[in-house]
Amino acid sequence: MVKQKRRLQKGAALVLSLLLLLGSLAGCGGKPQEDASGVDGPTNTYTPPVNEDGQIVITMPKTLLGGKTAEELEAEDKEQRQTAAQDGTLEQAVYDALLANEDGTFSYYLTKEQYPKLKAAYYWLGCLRDAYTTEISQEFVTAADYTDIDKNGIPWGLTVSVDAETYYSMEVWYSAVVTVAPAVMLGRYQVFCGVPGDEWAVHVTVKDADTGEVI
């Protein structure tokens, strides 16, 4: 698992900049589905304490930046917040701020009410589902199921079944879509569940939907 973790971490910066799945969490984003933690949703109940300002602070390691620097993410977030304010949609934000740290990491600042919404969004994105509808977001993916779920409800693995013909037609792209991208999203979910930033780990298995063989 450690070897797979390192491979996915190194590949994260290569792919996340081109991944459409991240669109639903771009900038301050829209509000994910309110009932995203239903029967088939996340079961982890961890909630970190609030600071003296009433904020929950979640820091993401550099291995989960998603292909950009922390400073770039902060600048983009501020720009998108200005646009949202002009459009009258800022109240839908799922966190209050995204700020770069001196060590190259970045931190989310959230209220206690916002925290479970962003946490649930990462849960769904980690298994290739739309954060709003919780439906699989890629047509060539027939199934995506979490595996290796621990006693705290934290998944450490993902099995993805794909249409092999489509997958191989653009293997470099589609391989990234079903491995690196969900690994980063699930890695962020793990951090939201209290996993230290240097201990996140995800193993992704891709299978041919017709034969069940591992690709």
Residue ranges and their predicted role:
Residues K3-V15:
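Bacterial N-terminal signal peptides that target proteins for export
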Residues G23-G27:
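C-terminal motif of bacterial Sec signal peptides marking the signal peptidase cleavage site
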Residues K31-I215:
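Mature, Sec-exported extracytoplasmic domains of Gram-positive
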